[in-house]
């Protein structure tokens, strides 16, 4: 199993950290309340958009990895069945 970060995952991490950093920067200083509310709503919308976009893809990745493992196991079991059948075919027919 490869544990390296893919560029897509790395981009998601960088964007998330950037948004969090900007959020802390804007709200640690004093803004006009209307501007502060607008920026806060903007970040909230981006956060919700991010959650709804990223979560289905992460679930698909988990399912595809699980499917790969199951298909690999089924292929191995099929090969073992074939080898055992060939090995014991002679003894069954005798």
From Swiss-Prot:
Main location per the UniProt record: membrane
Transmembrane segments: 9-29, 34-54
Name used for this protein in its record: Uncharacterized protein YbfE
GO cellular component: plasma membrane
Location(s), subcellular: Cell membrane
Keywords on record: Cell membrane, Membrane, Transmembrane, Transmembrane helix
Membrane topology: Multi-pass membrane protein
């Amino acid at each position: 199993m490869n544990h390296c970060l893919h560029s897509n995952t790395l981009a998601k991490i960088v964007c998330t950290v950037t948004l969090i950093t900007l959020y802390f920067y804007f709200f640690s200083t004093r803004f006009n309340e209307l501007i502060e509310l607008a920026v806060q709503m903007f970040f909230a919308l981006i956060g919700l958009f991010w959650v709804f976009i990223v979560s289905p893809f992460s679930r698909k990745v988990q399912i595809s990895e699980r499917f790969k493992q199951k298909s690999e196991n089924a292929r191995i079991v099929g090969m073992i069945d074939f080898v055992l059948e060939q090995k014991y075919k002679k003894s069954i027919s005798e």
